[in-house]
Amino acid sequence: MTYLLAPLVAWTVAQTAKVILYSVRAGRLNLRVLAVTGGMPSSHSAIVMGLTTAIGKHAGVASPAFAIALIFSFVVMYDAAGLRRAAGRQAAILNRLVEDLVHMRGVQEQKLRELLGHTPVEVLVGAVLGVAAGLIL
């Protein structure tokens, strides 16, 4: 059960922290952040590191399951901080180009979501939450 509980607790703590941080910043409760990707902390990092830590703690760091979970965690965190963040930057540039087209020709397009990935700090904080949940549970 710990293999499920640790990542779920890590995800819940990360998502709760995200709601609190964004609500304080906005000055009002903002539950919409629960349904979007990106932001502080990374719940993706929290959930995979919670699972990896629970496996390491209970099955051992020399187990095949730990090795698989660790590699999986690295892939997820690299994707969150690298690829999805780059896609978010590209979306920001495309949105500026579309704004220019609106002003020049009146072309109207839907804006792309820009907050897709995480900064390295957001990934690190999520990973720390996951490790903590895995060690505590």
Outline where the language-model segments fall.
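Feature marks short, highly hydrophobic, charge-poor N-terminal signal-anchor/signal peptide-like helices
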Residues: 1-5
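Membrane-embedded catalytic cores of phosphoryl/pyrophosphoryl-handling enzymes
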Residues: 12, 16-17, 29-137
